Amino acid sequence: MHAIAENHGVKASYTKEELQACGQGRLFGEGAAKLPVDQMLMVDRVSQISAEGGAYGHGIVRAQLDINPDLWFFKCHFVGDPVMPGCLGLDAMWQLVGFFLAWKGHKGLGRALGVGEVKFTGQVLPSAKSVEYVLDIKRVIARKLIMALADGTVYVDGKAIYTAKDLRVGLFDPAAMSGAEIK
């Protein structure tokens, strides 16, 4: 069930089209974790992914989201005071930790398992040009449970605005996901 794909880690960057393909199960093969698609995919491209480097020497992911005033969340959060919901930036970091596991070749259904600490010190407004996510992989556990831990930072136009410590994402056997409870 948690077999490693033979073609894992063959690329160091990914386009929006490739990320959408990941969400449809066409990028890393059958059984690989999927990204959300369409509006819930909070990433336009992965500019760097590596199993080496980063603050802990276990890997790094850099990805970007292009910002424009027409993005869906600016229309409803909040009327007259548009701002990207902070939870979407947090979700983007979880998406990228799961993507890292799939890129490494691990299989299973991806689920966010939590975060140790999150700090918001800024915001993403419609006038911004770009958001960058930087994830430093702390550890990958590959036993019965496949799990990655990472620290992440969200930048808007080059300025750090969110930090997250101990982001956790796990990959699960589909049979263990039959109800509301994760087994």
Swiss-Prot record:
Where it mainly occurs, coarsely classed, is: cytoplasm
One Pfam family per UniProt: FabA
What are the UniProt keywords, alphabetically?
Answer: Cytoplasm, Fatty acid biosynthesis, Fatty acid metabolism, Isomerase, Lipid biosynthesis, Lipid metabolism, Lyase
Q: What CDD domains does the record tag this protein with? A: FabA
Purpose: Necessary for the introduction of cis unsaturation into fatty acids. Catalyzes the dehydration of (3R)-3-hydroxydecanoyl-ACP to E-(2)-decenoyl-ACP and then its isomerization to Z-(3)-decenoyl-ACP. Can catalyze the dehydratase reaction for beta-hydroxyacyl-ACPs with saturated chain lengths up to 16:0, being most active on intermediate chain length.
- What NCBIfam families does the record tag this protein with? fabA, PRK05174.1
Q: Please give the family membership noted in the entry.
A: Belongs to the thioester dehydratase family. FabA subfamily.
Question: PANTHER family, from UniProt?
Answer: 3-HYDROXYACYL-[ACYL-CARRIER-PROTEIN] DEHYDRATASE, 3-HYDROXYDECANOYL-[ACYL-CARRIER-PROTEIN] DEHYDRATASE
Entry protein name: 3-hydroxydecanoyl-[acyl-carrier-protein] dehydratase
